[in-house]
Amino acid sequence: MELELWQFAVLFAAAFFGGFIDSIAGGGGLISLPALLAVGVPPHVAIATNRFQGSFGSFTAALNFIRKGYVDAAEILRGVIFTFVGGLVGAYVLLLIDAKFLNYLIPILLLALLFYMIFSPNLGEAPAKSKMSKKSFYAIFGLVLGFYDGFFGPGTGSFWTFALVGILGLYMKKAVAHTKVLNFTSNIVSLGVFIIGGQSLWLVGAVMAVGQIAGSFAGSSLVMRCDVKFVRKMLLFVVAATILKLLYGLIAS
């Protein structure tokens, strides 16, 4: 598939802004995936290419957070392992069954999450008491959310951040940092499945990857400088946008 120069420019810009938003609150795919579809990339190829370029963004954001000390490597290692396993199983199951039923379930779960955050205005502003041991948390949520990301995907970052803040008691910035590491883990697994299937546009993916790297670095750097309330507002915005996108897909179909 051949694209014109202006189309590459549009995709680069979409990847930059997608990476910027995603590194703060997740949901970057709400920008990058529609851009790929808008320039005529077939849906299955667009999904694979979006995973490819998005992996560079999540890696850049995760690395930036790790370098600045926002990630506890010893704590999150268990989560990485179980997320990897969950993502692998989810990506494999996706090849066997249809994920359409999740189009009905996920908006309901995200709506519940949205209202909980709205009525918990101080959530994530400071570390809180954990409601579950770290070992159990990372084992259970690593498998569940890793599987979900490999199988379906939308809202994974929001679910991770909410769980890390609401259940494990992390403050918002650290939760966002840990989310990026865990997101990258499940992204890279499902990406591997798509690569094996040969469904990615490499040149398009490479151009968008550059935009993702730049946007993700800018966004993750902003998270470390800005007020927690800003991160929370961005998270609320992304959750609401994801709900609307999924509901629109249901109505349109």
Predicted regions and their residues:
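Selective hydrophobic functional segments
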Residues: 48-101, 187-237
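Transmembrane helix-loop junction
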Residues: 38-39, 45, 91, 95, ...
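Membrane-interface alpha-helices at helix entry/exit sites of multi-pass transporters
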Residues: 41-50, 73-78, 169-180
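Residues within membrane-spanning alpha-helices of integral membrane proteins
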Residues: 8, 51, 107-110, 114, ...
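Selected transmembrane alpha-helices and immediately adjacent juxtamembrane segments
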Residues: 1-42, 127-176, 206
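Hydrophobic alpha-helical transmembrane segments in multi-pass integral membrane proteins
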Residues: 144-154, 190-198, 243-253
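Transmembrane helix exit motif
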Residues: 60-70, 99, 107-131, 241-253
